[in-house]
Amino acid sequence: MLAKVERIDPSELELNDKLIFINRVTKVVKGGKRMGFAALVVTGDGKNHVGIGVGKAKEVPSAISKASANAKRNLSRILLNGTTVPHEIVFKYGAAQVLLKPAAPGTGIIAGGSVRAVLESTGIKDILTKSMGCSNKANVAKATLGGLTAMRDPKTTVTKRRSSLKEEAAGG
């Protein structure tokens, strides 16, 4: 679902964590109810690196620290065109669908909820977004990250297409 990317060392970056949400979960056992917590954290340096992590624990602080550590393990490098994205993309993760459109300088981040948190952590300043389908914060955040990692440089894509067309003509 999400694109594979090269491993990024988090110790070399100045990362900031943002807590997207905390979920209280209950497990019913013979003796009663067991409470636990799940946290979703996005971490980024504001300079094209971002990661999302989920942590689960009996206490809130340990769930947040586990989520932060998980986000640092899942860092991705994002391709940007100045302060916005290079092209429009619609990405789907589960039932969540996110539309990311480039915007003119000075537009700002037109997004809400977990989409905004991921985009701010990435360092994007101008973008238009639309979240469709389900409103599950984890799936929306993962769809946003998936869309950002699926971005390709238009110039590189054009040169690859031209070279493959030349190979087709020469070989066929």
From Swiss-Prot:
Q: What does this protein do?
A: With S4 and S12 plays an important role in translational accuracy. Located at the back of the 30S subunit body where it stabilizes the conformation of the head with respect to the body.
Question: Can you state the subunit structure given in the record?
Answer: Part of the 30S ribosomal subunit. Contacts proteins S4 and S8.
Provide the domain comment.
The N-terminal domain interacts with the head of the 30S subunit; the C-terminal domain interacts with the body and contacts protein S4. The interaction surface between S4 and S5 is involved in control of translational fidelity.
Where does the S5 DRBM domain start and stop, copy by copy?
15-78
Q: Name one GO cellular component term.
A: small ribosomal subunit
What is the protein's given name?
Small ribosomal subunit protein uS5
Query: What HAMAP family does the entry give?
Result: Ribosomal_uS5_B
* Protein's GO biological process: translation
| Domain of life the protein comes from | Bacteria
Please report which protein family the annotation says this sequence is part of: Belongs to the universal ribosomal protein uS5 family.
Q: Which NCBIfam families match?
A: rpsE_bact
Which controlled-vocabulary keywords does the entry list?
Answer: Ribonucleoprotein, Ribosomal protein, RNA-binding, rRNA-binding
- Quote one Gene Ontology molecular function term: structural constituent of ribosome
Q: List, alphabetically, the Pfam families matched.
A: Ribosomal_S5, Ribosomal_S5_C
